[in-house]
A protein has these predicted regions:
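Catalytic core of soluble alpha/beta enzymes
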Residues: 161, 168-301, 328-330, 337
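Active-site pocket-lining/capping segments in soluble small-molecule metabolic enzymes
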Residues: 293-334, 339, 347-349
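Short amphipathic alpha-helical face segments that pack within enzyme cores
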Residues: 102-106, 278, 299-307
Length: 356
């Protein structure tokens, strides 16, 4: 069965909840989409929304790149050659992770639909379900508590709070949530906004509450140096996010920042599933815990991440809430969320259905 056609388009999916993190405010959500059609009518879909600040490619640039791609390297090729096609895609777009991700995910979806199996079965499912956290942006205390109440009412028991501007105010927000709902598990994400002094102050102020993890407190350039300056009890909470984009980064972190033993994999950083799977294998061999995160993304790429996350025994944390505040999407399905627990649907490929 051969690839017949490739289509590219962009879509503003909107957001019902604009938010602020340490280095930007988000008020619109544009995703790039790739559809790969086979001769028998099967259509695999991929999506991406990479961050210019993190990987050097914006979604607008992704769309421009995709529209310029000569897809003759795919069209006419057998879908059973997907592994080779994935490597060709990687070689062509190594420095363009958004472009790479959209094509990579579409190939995986088309291939596993052709095989009549869910994508997770192709990888080998290791876990059935895990809780995802849901994120609260940088807000004042009243707004923070209001949003926490809303998510609690929806059944979520893992909350991630964006921080990174002021450790004292950040700590106060987190403490207030813990006091109001002590059974909730709290995570924080400083998005590179702290110095070591800031982080130590934040940890000291929050020492009486239970924090599960702290994502990327330091800038990419200082991450390894600053992690090595932390007390081991603090370093073990730190998650490498923006500092982890590819297997080379993973190996460097293992070598030079051994106190950091949680990696956050995002398909928008790795360029899709092929490279993400390599990082997951490195983590599994090294006893590193995995967290799977996202940007503001279509169900398409969120589902792709969940399929791979549930195929790794090292996966301990999910933060795959990137589609929950979208005003619309181009697909439905992909996964189920009940009381904050994420489960796959058991349908072939990504398990998504195009909205007509």
């Amino acid at each position: 069965m051969k690839i017949k056609n490739v289509r590219v388009y962009g879509q503003d999916l909107g957001t019902s909840r604009p938010y602020t993190i340490a280095y930007k405010t988000v008020s619109e959500v544009i995703n790039a989409f790739v559809e790969i059609e086979l001769e028998n009518g099967i259509i695999g879909i991929g999506a991406s929304n990479s961050s210019k600040a993190v990987v050097g490619e914006s979604v607008d640039e992704t769309l421009n790149h995709l529209r310029d791609v000569d897809f003759s390297y795919l069209i006419g090729q057998k879908i059973t050659q997907t592994e080779g096609l994935l490597r060709q895609t990687h070689d062509k777009f190594t420095t363009l992770p958004g472009t790479h991700a959209a094509i990579d995910i579409a190939l995986h979806d088309a291939f596993t639909q052709f095989l009549n199996i869910p994508l997770v079965d192709y990888f080998g499912q290791q876990q059935r379900t895990l809780p995802t956290s849901i994120t609260i942006g940088i807000k004042n205390i009243e707004e923070t508590l209001s949003e926490a109440d809303e998510y609690y009412g929806m059944g979520f028991r893992f909350l991630k709070v964006k921080t990174g501007l002021n450790p004292a105010l950040d700590a106060e927000r987190v403490i207030k949530i813990s006091e109001r709902m002590p059974e909730v598990v709290l995570r924080v994400d400083a998005n590179q906004g702290y110095s070591t002094g800031d982080l130590n102050e934040f940890v000291k102020r929050t020492e009486k509450i239970k924090l599960e993890l702290i994502e990327q407190p330091f800038s990419i350039g200082n991450f390894i140096k600053y992690v090595n300056e932390l007390h081991p009890s603090i370093a073990q909470l730190v998650v490498a996010d923006e500092s982890l984009r590819n297997p080379k980064d993973a190996l460097q972190l293992l070598k030079d920042a051994s106190g950091c033993n949680i990696f956050n994999i995002k398909l928008m950083k790795t360029g899709g599933l092929l490279v993400a799977k390599q990082i997951a294998y490195i983590a599994e061999c090294s006893k590193v815990k995995l967290m799977w995160g996202c940007n503001d993304e279509s169900v398409v790429s969120i589902a792709a991440a969940l399929h791979l996350a549930l195929s790794s025994r090292s996966t301990k944390f999910l933060d795959l809430d990137g589609s929950l505040d979208l005003i619309k999407d181009v697909v439905t399905g992909g996964f189920l969320i009940k009381n904050g627990m994420m489960t796959l649907t058991g349908k072939n490929g990504l398990g998504v259905q195009k909205v007509s």
